[in-house]
């Protein structure tokens, strides 16, 4: 059910791919909004003009937002919330939201949210492929491929979203059915004051989640969750019970769950320790989604 109120004055800020997806979505729902972009002639301008009255489109300066009396902004991920006009509006109580907030309001199927400094595209793609191999209508997107709002359609069994830290900044109470933070290392330090501010943005993926997967070898991925929320950890070392990891014996190296051997590394098309970690994370997610990780369909992927 939508959480969008009818008395709000909204604007989409930025006409990149994500901003345009917000324009398309809001227009499809018959919701009034402004469009504002700091560029005089942004690449999505012509499409926006087909969906929004020209008198509600402003380009060349974001400061016009203050004159519009906005109460709710859908900010494109490429625009930092530290931008002066956005900071001033936030101080006045204007809601700073993003496309993933909109997605969450309207999605009617389970969704998986995946982030990390590295490998998030690989793992997002792999989880979607594994779900499809199990006969599920799974759609992948977000920061990868199609924007999340463009994925929404009937008869979808699962959505698998790659999310960037920029997207998570404007996401409040994500409530993913399954959230995964793969790793955290210094990235986008031109946007964040330090590693820990960046980590805090990444950690927002866990807010309200029903289950989680984290990296045992990276303490910055460890979630703080309510008691009873299922969590699976993965590691490229020997795993503890219920963890996913690697074991070696006379037959070679194995991907394992606890002491249970799952797949020999020779069966894995993706080679190298980093890719084994990606596969382990994906298997942990498939288990938490209630599917058989040892099925013939999974083994063939």
Question: Which residue ranges define each predicted feature?
Answer:
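N-terminal leader/targeting and accessory segments in enzymes
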Residues: 1-98, 102, 271, 291
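Adenine nucleotide phosphate-binding catalytic loops in nucleotide-utilizing enzymes
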Residues: 8, 13-15, 194-196, 230-301
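Short, hydrophobic beta-strand segments that form beta-sheet elements in well-ordered domains
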Residues: 12, 33-37, 57-58, 73-75, ...
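Cofactor-binding loop segments of dinucleotide-utilizing enzymes, especially the Rossmann-like FAD-
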Residues: 15, 38, 116-117, 143, ...
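Short, solvent-exposed loop/turn elements at beta->coil junctions and helix N-caps
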Residues: 62, 166, 299-300
């Amino acid at each position: 059910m939508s959480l969008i109120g009818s008395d709000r004055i909204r604007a989409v800020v930025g006409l990149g791919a994500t901003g345009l997806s917000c324009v398309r979505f809001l227009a499809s729902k018959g919701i009034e909004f402004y469009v504002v972009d700091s560029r005089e002639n942004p690449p999505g301008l012509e499409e926006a003009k087909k969906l929004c009255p020209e008198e509600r489109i402003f380009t060349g300066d974001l400061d016009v937002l203050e004159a519009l009396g906005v109460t709710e902004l859908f900010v494109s991920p490429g625009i930092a919330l530290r931008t002066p006009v956005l900071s001033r509006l936030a101080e006045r109580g204007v809601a700073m939201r993003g496309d993933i907030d909109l997605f969450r309001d309207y999605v009617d199927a389970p969704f998986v949210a995946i982030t990390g400094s590295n490998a998030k595209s690989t793992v997002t793609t792999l989880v979607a492929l594994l779900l499809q191999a199990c006969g599920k209508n799974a759609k992948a997107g977000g920061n990868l491929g199609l924007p999340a709002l463009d994925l929404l359609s009937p008869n979808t069994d699962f959505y698998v979203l790659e999310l960037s830290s920029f997207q998570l900044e404007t996401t409040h109470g994500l409530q993913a059915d399954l959230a995964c933070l793969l790793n955290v290392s210094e990235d986008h330090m031109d946007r964040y004051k330090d590693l820990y501010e960046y980590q805090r943005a990444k950690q927002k993926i866990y807010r309200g989640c029903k289950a989680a997967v984290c990296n045992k070898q990276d303490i910055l991925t460890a979630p703080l969750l309510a008691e009873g929320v299922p969590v699976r950890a993965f590691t490229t070392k020997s795993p503890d019970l219920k963890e996913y990891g690697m074991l070696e014996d006379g037959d070679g190296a194995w991907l394992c769950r606890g002491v249970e051997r799952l797949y020999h590394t020779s069966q894995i098309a993706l080679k190298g320790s980093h890719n084994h970690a990606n596969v382990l994370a994906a298997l942990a997610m498939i288990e938490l989604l209630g599917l058989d990780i040892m099925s013939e369909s999974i083994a063939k992927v």
